[in-house]
Amino acid sequence: MRPVPGTCIFTRADLRDCGWSDAAVSRAIRSGRLLRHRRGLLSLPGRPGPQPATAAAVRACSGGVASHRSALLIHGLPVVGAPPPLPELTVAPRGVGGLHRAALYRASLPARDVTVVDDIPVTSIARTLVDVARHRPVTAAVAAIDAALHGRLVTMGELDDVMLRCWNWPRIRRAQRALRLVDARSESPLESVSRLVLSWLRLPTPDLQPVVLDESGRAVGRLDFYWDEFGVLGEADGRSKYDARAVLTAEKERQEQFEDLGLVVVRWGWEHATRRHNALRARLLSGFERGRLRDRSGFPRLWTL
């Protein structure tokens, strides 16, 4: 196959500059080696993520910038819940009108709030997170912000700067509430969502990410959640029964190590964190009761981050 431009999305003219003829482009489209988007825009098939559709929407929308959930995906941050059905763009308040196959938000976009990823204009990480916190459920916002803070992709100072500049925008109080709930120690979206759900269920507040040490002082592993008063550890497990056997075996061996140290292990997944809250509460309360009945004199030592 002939060389193609290094950008995510390109035109026939771009391909001609790379030595393609119009006939060759047409043949590649018919055979599926090139994908055709709106207004004559093209991309390679199989590119991971939503970039081709988003790039096509941005290119078709003068002054449009990828934002909100589309920006999360471009920045490699988690989207809790369904992915956006359409590319999400932000345009100037008096910018372009309705655009087919794109969801438009109208807002000011100073230069500091815009960056470029894979040749796509996109809102900065800090601006993206504040926008998501204003418009999406708190679970989605906190999971994305936790991931960015944990990965050191953004700082609280950068988020506060955007918040101050947007202090009078719609739904800014919603974003403020989300920012008060974030915790950079969470290592996965499921942990972030679970942390919120545990609070809503009025369960005791757990320690996050403590390291378990055995009698010799050797680190056995780090826990997602730990309730020291009960000797109970909580594992937010996003894996499924279809994951590789080696991974599942390693998880089982890890659980047995903790149980050998006298800990009660309670596991849950996305189903409990998103829909079966009462079942999660019952599972943890049962674990707390079992922990109360155990001899706690030999409990392992913990080192908290």
Locate predicted features.
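Surface segments flanking catalytic/ligand-binding clefts of nucleic-acid enzymes
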Residues: G6, G19, R112, L149-L305
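Short gly/ser-rich loop at a beta-strand->alpha-helix junction or flexible surface loop bordering the NTP-binding
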Residues: M1-R173, D207, F288-L305
